[in-house]
Amino acid sequence: MISIAALLLTRALPACAGGREIADPSGGNPLFGMAQQMANFVYLVADAATKQAAVVDACWDCAGVAKIAEGLGLTITGALYTHKHFDHGGGAVPERMATGPGGSKIMLEGAQTMAALGAEVFVCAADGPDLASATGLAAVTPLEEGTVL
């Protein structure tokens, strides 16, 4: 399972509890076993006053992340990615790790799905072009050290 931790920047939301599991095997994701082995973490950071949230490294189960946010009454307006690797930002899974039916590439949803859900996508400037290319996005918002969001 992949854990999603919730950290609220102002006063805590009563319904919020850290450590929720996403990437549920009942969802039929062919990559569930890999997701479980990689033990990636996703963080949902929210402002309790505005109910706006940003998600960090949402990749394996974006629908699960969105469902948790919705259940907390939050609107995800930003998706921040720590780096360009497929298991953080999405894109094609390396062939040596997994291929789909008929040898087709398996894609992780990641940044592309979060953008489709209305979130602005952020990543460090050096990884921006690669993440955009890997996920099919026209562009992502670059972050430099010291950027204030």
Spans of features found by a protein language model:
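Zn-dependent metallo-beta-lactamase
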Residues: 1-72
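Active-site HxH/HxHxD metal-binding segment of metal-dependent hydrolases
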Residues: 38-39, 61-149
